[in-house]
C-alpha cells in the first residue's frame, strides 16, 4: 500500500478526492464548525457514534463531502491501542466497498504514537497474501486499497513517526510474506536469497554459509537437525552498520525451520501444514532489517538465521542420539521435535564473536507458551531487568506486546542427562521455561533475551496467516536504543583493547 501524510482538517479531508473517507473521532469535543464536523458532533450527541474504540457509523453521500462513502470510527482516548481498534474496524468496513483510494483523517490532534498505530493498523487490515494464488479475470487478486492518505492537524510534527511506521510496515509485510509461503516456496535456499536481496539496502550486508562452512565451524547441533532433509541448510548473517565500527551491536537470532515435521518424533497430521510458520522467527529478523535499511538509525545490528528443514528420512537424528554443539557441550536429543533449540544454540554461540551489547533470539519454540499466553502476548525470558523493561516498553509502544516469564535455576533440573552435558527437553511441566533455560546455557555472559512467539507469529482458522510479529516490537526497541544513546556503548573487550597500557599512562604522567 502507498501511504501519504498530509495536513488535513476535517473540512479539508472532506474536499479530498477519494473512494472512501474515514474520520477517526476521539472522545474530546469537536470545535470545528464545518458541515462534516457538525454532523459528527450531532451523531455523537445522539448516541449514534459512541466513544468506545472500534464503534462505527457509515454515511452515504453526506453534504459537501467529495467521497461518496464516509466511515466515522471512534478511537476513544486516542491512545495507540484505541487507534488500532478504530482503524482496523474502519478499514475492514471500507474494504466492502472495494475502494482503491482512501483518505483517513484524525478529527482531533494526533501524536506520533497515534499516527504510527494508524499506519500499522491500516496496513494490517488491508493486507492480502497473493504469491501462490492465480490472478482473477480482471488481473487482480490482491488488496483493493492501493493508496491511503493520512490526514493530521500538523504533518510536519509527526513526519518522523510516520516515516518510521511506514518502514516498519514494509518490514512486517516482508515477514508476513515469507511466513505465509508454503514450504516448497520457502526453502532454506530461497530464504537465503531473500536475505541477499536485503543486502542491497543501504548499510546492510549479507553473508550466507552452507553445509561445509557450518560443519567447519563445529555447529554439530544445527547440522544434526538438517541432516534428515534433502534441502541443504543455510546460515544467514546480516549486518546493518548505522553506528561507528567500535559500537557493540545488538544481535538478533531468528529460528529458521522452513518446515517442521517433528522428525522421527513425528507430529500429528492435523494442522501440520501450519508448521510452515516455524520460520517466523527468521522472517521477523529479515523484516526488521528491511525496516532498518529504510529508516537508517544510528545503531549497529547483526542478524543470524540458522535455517533448515526438520524431516525424517534414513539419515535423520533419532531420539537418544548425542550431538556436539559449537560450544563444545554435548546434547542428548530426547525429542527430535524440540529441534528449534538445537539450531538456535549454535547460533547463540556464533553470536559471541560480535561482542554484542545484547542478543535477542526469536523463535516459534514451544506449544507450552501458547497454552500460557495464547495469541495476545509473546513470551519474554531474560535475567536482565533493564533489557526486559526495554523490550516490554517497545511492545507497548508498537502494540506488539510481550510478557516476562521466570528463569529460576530450578527449572533446569529436568534438563540433566546421564549421557550428555544436557538433554534437549525436560518434560511437560513449564515447557516454555525449560526451553528458555536450555538456550540460556549457550548465551554465555552477554546480555540475552528470548522471545517465544509460538502463539503470536500466526493465526489459525478463517484468519489463518502470518502476523509479522514481533517486527514491530524489535524495530521499536532498536529505534529507542538508537535515540537514547544506549547504542553507542562499546563492547567491554573492545574498550579494554583501546585502554592504554600502564607504561604509556606512566610516561604521559611524567611529561
Swiss-Prot record:
Which key words are in the record?
A: Aminopeptidase, Cytoplasm, Hydrolase, Manganese, Metal-binding, Protease
* Any GO molecular function: metalloaminopeptidase activity
Region (Disordered), start-end ranges: 485-511
> Sorted alphabetically, which SUPFAM superfamilies does this protein's record hold?
Macro domain-like, Zn-dependent exopeptidases
Q: Which GO terms describe its biological process?
A: proteolysis
Q: Which domain of life is it from?
A: Bacteria
Identify the enzyme class: hydrolase
Q: Where in the cell is it found?
A: Cytoplasm
Q: What is its EC number?
A: 3.4.11.1, 3.4.11.10
Tell me the cofactor note: Binds 2 manganese ions per subunit.
Classification via InterPro entries: Leucine_aapep/pepB (IPR011356), Macro_dom-like (IPR043472), Peptidase_M17_C (IPR000819), Peptidase_M17_leu_NH2_pept (IPR023042), Peptidase_M17_N (IPR008283)
Catalytic residues in the record: 267, 341
Entry's Gene Ontology cellular component terms: cytoplasm
Known catalytic reactions: Release of an N-terminal amino acid, Xaa-|-Yaa-, in which Xaa is preferably Leu, but may be other amino acids including Pro although not Arg or Lys, and Yaa may be Pro. Amino acid amides and methyl esters are also readily hydrolyzed, but rates on arylamides are exceedingly low; Release of an N-terminal amino acid, preferentially leucine, but not glutamic or aspartic acids
**According to its UniProt record, which cofactors does this protein need?**
Mn(2+)
What the entry lists under CDD domains is as follows: Peptidase_M17
- Residues the record lists as binding Mn(2+) 2: 255, 260, 278, 339
Q: Identify the residues that bind Mn(2+) 1.
A: 260, 337, 339
Q: Please classify the protein's predominant subcellular localization into one broad category.
A: cytoplasm
Q: Which Pfam families match?
A: Peptidase_M17 (PF00883), Peptidase_M17_N (PF02789)
Q: Which PROSITE patterns match?
A: CYTOSOL_AP
Q: List the disulfide bonds.
A: none
Record's function text: Presumably involved in the processing and regular turnover of intracellular proteins. Catalyzes the removal of unsubstituted N-terminal amino acids from various peptides.
What family is reported? Belongs to the peptidase M17 family.
For this entry, the protein name equals Probable cytosol aminopeptidase
Annotated organism of origin: Variovorax paradoxus (strain S110)
Which lineage do the record's taxonomy fields give for this organism?
A: Bacteria, Pseudomonadati, Pseudomonadota, Betaproteobacteria, Burkholderiales
